[in-house]
Amino acid sequence: MNYVLVQIAKRYLCITACETVGEAAANGTANKGNSKKQADPNEKKAYSFSSPLIIPVDKAVLKDKSSVWEDPALLARLVKDGLSTMNHSEVRDVILMVESYDLTCQEYQHIRGAKRIIEGLAIDRIRDFVGEAASDFSVIYKDYSTYKTKEVNEEITSKAFAMPKALADDLVAGFKSFSLNLIQIIPSEAAMIYAAQKTIYSFNKTVALISMDYSAVRVFIAKNGVPLYCHEFTSPVDEILQ
């Protein structure tokens, strides 16, 4: 396995090991006599996933903390121990999937423009919430457009996601202290928007996607290939189990 996906809920961690699968394995055929063939950057990669491991995070684990976000080193140790339990101690690269309720988020509308301009708009929307402290946040955005229309003044909806830079730095340092590399922090909603644009067939119809796991309930609506609505709620799984 090459990577571990880490999802964080209030009382649980969900970790899943994964790896990219070679062309021969993905196609189910051997690539004999063609070992020097260059990879096609447009070719869709295939992945193999382990069974998820659910790690309880209770008061005994947190001690005087209210969540693992307050102790990145604890989060890293739990992931490290989880990989050992899964017999995947060889994994070093970590992808952290963050739910929107743990981020500062804001939807906004804009017309098509240069990437740097749209990024500036995203920062402005976050500034509406955090004021001048916006410079202390790392901000990314994901637009809902499929870029299949060419209207210059078409109004597009985007969503900005922000995390304190200091927290991101502490997370990197925390994982590094356990010989793990935090290579990416991804908002789960951004991943869902991307997936809907690429994989959900919604042309000439409206499609609703509802996902519930230990981390969140995610509601997503797409129409004619364009995402219309995306929102996350705290998962009720823990309350159901109680």
Model-predicted segments: where are they?
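Phosphate- and other anionic-substrate recognition elements at nucleic-acid/protein interfaces
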Residues: 24, 29-42, 47-49, 73, ...
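Short secondary-structure junctions
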Residues: 88-89, 130-137, 177-180
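Phosphate-interacting basic helix/loop segments used at nucleotide- and nucleic-acid interfaces
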Residues: 73-87, 191-192, 199-204
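Short glycine-rich phosphate-binding loop at a beta-alpha junction
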Residues: 88-101, 175, 184
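Internal amphipathic helical hairpin motif
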Residues: 72-73, 98-158
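Solvent-exposed alpha-helical segments within well-ordered globular domains of core cellular machineries
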Residues: 77-84, 120, 124-128, 169, ...
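N-terminal phosphate-binding loop and adjacent alpha-helix
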Residues: 37, 44-85, 241-242
